[in-house]
């Protein structure tokens, strides 16, 4: 009787993130923190950025305790010079491959009571911050010849979805993030740079609980982080420029 050779199952394909350098903003808590942990678990060296340095150190400590690589860098993403320092330091650690922009603020106020200062802070962190980080990452990725970005917007920025009252500045900032992602996709194509946007509904974060304690979110930060990692680990080019709404049924 002929001997049947044993068959070894094929090894799973290597994860795209494994061994790469990624920057995650808003990484001190919420979606950003969960994403930093998940990206590190996928094998990337993660540079964590947020204003709260103490909280960043805590998240970085969790990653290192689990055997991952993490570098916390306290950064105000609305400050151009601070963002330039962030990406200069990251560039000294290796070739930047991935960026996740999750930094955001949410200050609810009736439209008529929204002050120019409240408006400016929301737009500067949520939209200008994303622009500054994406621009710095884009420059590094052009040199590398490839790169992947995921920007976090919101259903608040998606056309024709129901909006909550008191979020005029937040809504506008998230519409802008979606448009920014589309622009990056257009100009990044020739350089091998892809960008997609995620627009979650209600996610169970500290920021949302402060803004609307009565809301019962249907998504967790870990849910969103898992999708971000799945996107980064997949070829993004066919979907570059897309906005993916996540309905949480809150």
Over which residues does each language-model region extend?
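Conserved NAD(P)H cofactor-binding loop of Rossmann-fold oxidoreductase domains
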Residues: 102-108
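Residue(s) in the substrate-gating loop at a strand-loop-helix junction
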Residues: 154
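Conserved glycine-rich cofactor-binding loop
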Residues: 21, 28-29
């Amino acid at each position: 009787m002929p001997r049947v050779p044993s068959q070894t199952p094929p090894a799973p394909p290597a994860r795209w993130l494994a061994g790469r350098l990624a920057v995650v903003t808003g990484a001190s808590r919420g979606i950003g923190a969960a994403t930093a942990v998940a990206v590190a678990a996928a094998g990337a060296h993660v540079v964590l950025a947020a204003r709260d340095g103490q909280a960043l150190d805590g998240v970085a400590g969790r990653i290192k305790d689990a055997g991952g690589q993490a570098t916390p860098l306290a950064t105000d993403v609305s400050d151009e010079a601070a963002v330039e320092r962030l990406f200069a330091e990251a560039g000294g650690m290796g070739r930047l491959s991935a960026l996740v922009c999750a930094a955001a603020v949410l200050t609810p106020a009736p439209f008529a009571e929204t002050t120019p200062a409240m408006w400016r802070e929301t737009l500067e962190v949520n939209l200008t911050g994303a622009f500054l980080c994406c621009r710095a990452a884009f420059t590094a990725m052009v040199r590398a010849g490839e790169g992947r970005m995921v920007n976090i917007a919101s259903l608040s920025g998606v056309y024709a979805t129901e909006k909550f009252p008191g979020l005029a500045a937040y809504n506008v900032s998230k519409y802008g993030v979606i448009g920014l992602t589309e622009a990056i996709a257009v100009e990044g194509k020739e350089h091998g740079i892809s960008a997609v946007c995620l627009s979650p509904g209600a996610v169970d974060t500290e920021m949302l609980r402060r803004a609307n304690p009565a809301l019962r979110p249907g998504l967790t930060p870990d849910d969103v982080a898992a999708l971000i990692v799945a996107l980064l680990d997949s070829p993004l080019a066919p979907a570059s420029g897309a906005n993916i709404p996540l309905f949480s049924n809150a």
